[in-house]
């Protein structure tokens, strides 16, 4: 089983990492190519391209200038400890043991506009480059063209080492990021967990809660060493319950009704 997550825009380089182990990202040469292109942009260009504030554009202009193809604990941090958004609050890697993180290293992957595909312990230098950014490059009009089938091929290398029910991809990424994966070329079926909360008289996806729940699901897989997708149906963290009637073989729906 491989579970894929989206990255986070919010980053934490202040909190010291609680583990020393780290690995190097697989697509450093590709990331370097993107950085070379990003370095040609002014802060004003970055603000317009990414629809971000001027201070944030200046911050990322400097990040691109500082970025190095040499990764060390002095200039980078393990990805799963550096990302700090809703998904990663749910995953809460800071409280996972080194043994848990070793398991995550084999079963969790993070999709990234700059780095392509990251393992949890891959070193990450600070950046901002969302997968949906229409950043024209030598390979095409946007990052989907840039990455092509590279991410899918990398996932297949991992999936092909699994067998039976364990050869499955669990999609806990956003639509924007999962578009970088080509399901028809994958060497495994895809299961997408969907998290809905009761609000206004019906069940609906509430972005903040759904993002957190994706992280909780990834943690559930890691802590319980899950390899069989049927075991995902037992997920019940923070009140979510698997709804068999709303689910099918490729979409697992979890619902929560609180306070009504």
UniProtKB/Swiss-Prot annotation:
One of its GO terms (cellular component) is cytosol. GO terms for biological process: response to hydroperoxide. It comes from the Bacteria. Coiled coil: none annotated. Pfam families: H2O2_YaaD (PF03883). InterPro entries: YaaA (IPR005583). Belongs to the UPF0246 family. This is UPF0246 protein Bcenmc03_2247.
């Amino acid at each position: 089983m491989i579970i894929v997550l989206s990255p986070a825009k919010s980053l934490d380089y202040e909190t010291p990492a609680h583990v020393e182990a780290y690995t190097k990202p697989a697509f450093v040469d590709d990331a370097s190519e993107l950085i070379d292109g990003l370095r040609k942009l002014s802060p004003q260009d970055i603000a317009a391209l990414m629809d971000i504030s001027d201070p944030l554009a200046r911050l990322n202009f400097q990040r691109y200038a500082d970025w190095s193809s040499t990764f060390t604990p002095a200039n980078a941090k393990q990805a799963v400890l550096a990302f700090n958004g809703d998904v990663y609050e749910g995953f809460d890697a800071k409280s996972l043991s080194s043994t848990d993180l070793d398991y995550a290293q084999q079963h969790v992957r993070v999709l990234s506009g700059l780095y392509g595909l990251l393992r949890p312990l891959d070193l990450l230098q600070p950046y901002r480059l969302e997968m949906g950014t229409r950043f024209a490059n030598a390979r095409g009009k946007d990052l989907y063209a840039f990455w092509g089938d590279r991410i899918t091929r990398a996932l297949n290398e991992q999936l092909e080492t699994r067998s039976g029910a364990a050869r499955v991809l669990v999609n806990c990424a956003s639509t924007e990021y999962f578009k970088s994966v080509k399901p028809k070329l994958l060497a495994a079926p895809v299961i997408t967990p969907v998290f809905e909360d009761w609000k206004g008289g019906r069940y609906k996806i509430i972005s903040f809660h759904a993002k957190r729940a994706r992280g909780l699901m990834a943690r559930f897989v890691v802590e319980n060493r899950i390899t069989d997708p049927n075991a995902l149906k037992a997920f019940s963290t923070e009140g979510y319950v698997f709804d068999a009637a709303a689910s099918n073989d490729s979409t697992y729906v979890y619902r929560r009704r609180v306070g009504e």
